[in-house]
Regions:
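Conserved anion-binding
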Residues: 5-12, 21-132, 136-139
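Residues within well-ordered alpha-helical secondary structure of globular protein domains
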Residues: 44, 126, 146, 180-183
């Protein structure tokens, strides 16, 4: 479950996280935050993963990887419009646990639009990734098709199209997707 710690976001979170089942991983979402800020949030909210949604460099990710506990995962986001040079990912391979591919838009996420997933055919890494960007119920057939490929898709990241309002998910829609995925396995 993602908690957005970027103050310019309509989904900005600065409250107390309610008690969650241990099976739900708490992910802090950051945009060009300092190492100090990320460390503070990891401690304050007992985060299990950090999602970097800004212009964080390989060096930044490498430093973060060295100073956070080993069990905390790093997810580096890359925004895609029509094309993408997957070669730039090579330098991030050893300093990130996952990649996340989102649609390039005005905001760093939550734009509600999809990118052309055909570009992922050029993904040659074995590094698992999250598929994101404007995924709603209307896209679930296409999601199910791409999940049948050999791509190392780790998870589907849903956001704006599953919200009642920014930061508040429609639980019924989330259940529908989870049940749909469960019965298709």
């Amino acid at each position: 479950m993602g908690f957005i710690f970027w103050e310019k976001s309509a989904r900005y979170f600065d409250e107390i996280i309610p008690e969650l089942p241990k099976s739900i991983q708490k992910v802090g979402v950051f945009v060009n935050a300092s190492l100090e800020e990320i460390l503070k949030k990891i401690t304050k909210y007992d985060l299990q993963a950090v999602q970097l949604h800004g212009d964080e460099s390989v060096e930044f990710c490498e430093t973060l990887k060295k100073i956070i506990p080993k069990e905390i995962e790093i997810i580096k986001v890359f925004s895609i419009l029509d094309t993408f040079d997957f070669q730039i990912l090579n330098a991030f391979e050893s300093v990130c646990d996952y990649f996340l591919f989102d649609t390039k838009g005005k905001l760093p996420g939550g734009n509600g639009t999809t990118f052309d997933w055909k570009v992922l055919r050029n993904y040659s890494s074995t590094k698992p990734f999250f598929l994101s960007g404007g995924i709603g119920m209307e896209e679930m057939n296409a999601v199910n098709e791409i999940l049948k490929t050999n791509l190392p898709i780790y998870a589907i990241d849903v956001n704006s199209k599953f919200e009642i309002e920014p930061g508040l998910k429609n639980i019924q829609l989330c259940r529908e997707v989870a049940m749909q995925r469960h019965y298709q396995k």
